[in-house]
C-alpha cells in the first residue's frame, strides 16, 4: 500500500471515530453547522502557502507546504465520501 493511500485510510477512520485530540476530527467538527467550511478554509490556506513557497523558490518550504495541501485535500475528499480509488481512476482516465 502506498503512503498516500495509508494516510487516506487513517483520515477516513478518524472522520468516522472522531478520537479526542485528532486534528482530522477537529477539522470535521469545528464548524457544527457546516463542517465543510473549516476544511475548505484549510485547503485554501495551504494552497496559498504552497504558491508562496513556489514563488519564493524555497524547495524545502515547497515540499512542506505541498504535503500540507495534499493532506487537507485528502481530508476534503474523505469527508465528501470520495474513495482514494475514485481519485486514482480519474488520474488513469486522464492518461488516455
From Swiss-Prot:
One of its GO terms (cellular component) is cytoplasm. It catalyses: 1-(5-phospho-beta-D-ribosyl)-ATP + H2O = 1-(5-phospho-beta-D-ribosyl)-5'-AMP + diphosphate + H(+). It comes from the Archaea. Pathway: Amino-acid biosynthesis; L-histidine biosynthesis; L-histidine from 5-phospho-alpha-D-ribose 1-diphosphate: step 2/9. The gene is hisE. GO terms for biological process: L-histidine biosynthetic process. InterPro entries: HisE, PRib-ATP_PPHydrolase-like. Its EC number is 3.6.1.31. This is Phosphoribosyl-ATP pyrophosphatase.
